Design a protein with these regions (language model features):
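Electrostatic, structured charged patches in enzyme active sites and in nucleic-acid/phosphate-binding
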Residues: 1-152
Length: 152
């Protein structure tokens, strides 16, 4: 499973934009779905448009674009197997200037998380820690920037 994730990282950053200049991840985000706030964020760092599922993800993409320590990123780029039939698609895969990779999950608030989501975050963090990948759930707190939680 570890080799599979590392191969996905390599493939994600080798993926070229399609004819519409969009860079899709493992899980495609379709634009124009009813009651969803999807967007395409044009990114110089990525060399194409990055699809996002929400306004919060769009705001995070803007932050990544402006962060000087980030050289590249992709949305929904990893498909992580959690159990026999359960998969997880973290929101962002990030490549930093020091050659490291980070995985970010963006959620609206701590209060909105169910217990099973905390358990899922912990399982993902454990799996990615073995691969020496940083896993950061970003939880938006009103009137503050992002609450930065790091799992080591």
């Amino acid at each position: 499973i570890h080799h599979y994730i590392l191969e996905q990282i390599k493939t994600a950053f080798a993926t070229e934009p399609n004819i519409a200049a969009t860079i899709h991840g493992q899980r495609r985000i379709f634009q124009g779905c009813y009651r969803r706030r999807t967007a395409l964020f044009p990114s110089k760092k990525c060399g194409g448009s990055i699809p996002t599922e929400s306004r919060l993800e769009l705001a995070h993409a803007v932050c990544l674009e402006q962060n000087p320590s980030v050289i590249n990123y992709r949305s929904q780029a990893l498909k992580i197997k959690l159990s026999h039939e359960q998969y997880c698609y973290p929101d962002f895969l990030i490549q930093t200037i020091d050659g490291c990779y980070e995985v970010h999950e963006v959620k609206p608030s701590v209060a909105s998380l169910a217990l099973d989501e905390y358990v899922r975050f912990d399982r993902i963090a454990t799996l990615l820690h073995i691969l020496v990948l940083m896993y950061h759930p970003f939880l938006f707190v009103p009137y503050q920037p992002f609450l930065f939680l790091t799992y080591h």
